């Protein structure tokens, strides 16, 4: 899988034209920058007026334009969203100063400066809306109305982080429709405040074993190593504080005195049948799984996946190579 969400991890100049609104913004900002720069040079040469701080502004705007070009061509605007937003806001203030410096002047060079900065101001305002609009906003479908392949900057953030920590909803809220999860019987389950309740995949910011023999999230895997379905617990996963802790429930896997793992029959006794993948969905964008979350899977743009259930923000999916895991629903389109 690629290391970036944009596909091959390289630069694709065709992506500049994949989002029609961004294409117009690039034209406005590039033409505006050229006009403003030539106007400032002419104004300085004529000795009509010193441009002063506008020289800083013009080069700040140049670096922003280049950075946005690179971000779009690599489809990585989401990774630099905060930096681009901050510097675009600063550049917007300077662009207004640029308009004010020459709009009332009778000198043609100053008028060119004002005209150039006016085009840049329009581009900066729309860029700020594009970079800061979240998926739940009414502006989101508007700023992405002509998008034919660019990953929206807010897509990854809002699909993975859906609230603060707490009982039942953590920093990484995951929903997996399907069965085969681990119940509350594993060593008494996890703590309510920082818990990670597997089987519904409502994950908290972390977990604390309430009792002695609780396995870690990374140790709960299936035979195919995907982290879904019935648990398979190795001897290294046992956090032992006592052979027969009072908090262990009847559903907890038995552990021998020498730390041997429970038999597959004992561990899988509570598991259910394999989930039915009744839907198919095509990936609208490429996605790289979070390295800290073993339940997520990566996929490429245009890839078709099998889906268990199409409800919720995270879907249980299976790739063509048999790999299973959860995927963000806003990256998928049902077929």
From Swiss-Prot:
One of its GO terms (cellular component) is plasma membrane. Pfam families: SH3_1 (PF00018). InterPro entries: SH3-like_dom_sf, SH3_domain, Sho1_SH3. Residues 238-272 are annotated as: Disordered. SMART domains: SH3 (SM00326). It is a multi-pass membrane protein. Residues 276-335 form the SH3 domain. Residues 1-20, 74-83, 133-335 are cytoplasmic. It is found in: Cell membrane. Keywords: Cell membrane, Membrane, SH3 domain, Stress response, Transmembrane, Transmembrane helix. One of its GO terms (biological process) is regulation of actin filament polymerization. The chain crosses the membrane at residues 21-41, 53-73, 84-104, 112-132. Residues 42-52, 105-111 are extracellular. Belongs to the SHO1 family. Forms homooligomers. Plasma membrane osmosensor that activates the high osmolarity glycerol (HOG) MAPK signaling pathway in response to high osmolarity. PANTHER family: ACTIN CYTOSKELETON-REGULATORY COMPLEX PROTEIN SLA1 (PTHR15735:SF19), FCH AND DOUBLE SH3 DOMAINS PROTEIN (PTHR15735). This is High osmolarity signaling protein SHO1.
């Amino acid at each position: 899988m690629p290391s970036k969400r944009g596909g091959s991890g390289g630069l694709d100049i065709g992506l500049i034209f994949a989002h029609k609104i961004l294409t117009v913004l690039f034209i406005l900002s590039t033409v505006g920058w050229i006009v403003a720069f030539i106007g400032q040079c002419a104004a300085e040469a004529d000795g009509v007026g010193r441009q002063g701080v506008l020289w800083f502004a013009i080069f700040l705007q140049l670096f922003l334009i280049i950075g946005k070009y690179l971000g779009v061509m690599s489809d990585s605007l989401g990774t630099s969203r905060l930096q681009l937003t901050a510097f675009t806001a600063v550049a917007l203030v300077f662009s207004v100063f640029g308009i004010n410096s020459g709009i009332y002047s009778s000198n043609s060079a100053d008028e060119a400066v004002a005209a150039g900065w006016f085009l840049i101001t329009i581009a900066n305002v729309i860029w700020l809306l594009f970079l800061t609009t979240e998926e739940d906003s009414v502006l989101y479908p508007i700023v992405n109305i002509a998008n034919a392949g660019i990953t929206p900057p807010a897509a990854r953030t809002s699909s993975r982080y859906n609230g603060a920590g707490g009982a039942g909803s953590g920093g990484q809220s995951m929903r997996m429709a399907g069965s085969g999860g681990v119940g509350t019987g594993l060593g008494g389950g996890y703590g309510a405040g920082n818990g990670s309740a597997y089987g519904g995949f409502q994950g908290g910011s972390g977990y604390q074993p309430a009792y002695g023999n609780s396995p870690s999230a990374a140790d709960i895997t299936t035979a195919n190593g995907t982290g879904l379905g019935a648990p398979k617990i190795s001897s290294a996963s046992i956090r032992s504080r006592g052979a027969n802790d009072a908090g262990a429930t009847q559903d907890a896997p038995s552990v021998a005195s020498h730390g041997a793992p429970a038999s597959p029959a004992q561990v899988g006794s509570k598991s259910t049948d394999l989930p039915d993948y009744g839907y198919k969905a095509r990936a609208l964008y490429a996605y790289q799984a979070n390295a800290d979350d073993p339940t997520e899977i990566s996929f490429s743009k245009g890839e078709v996946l099998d889906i268990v259930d199409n409800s919720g923000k995270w879907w249980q999916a299976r790739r063509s190579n048999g790999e299973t895991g959860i995927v963000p629903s806003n990256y998928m389109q049902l077929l």
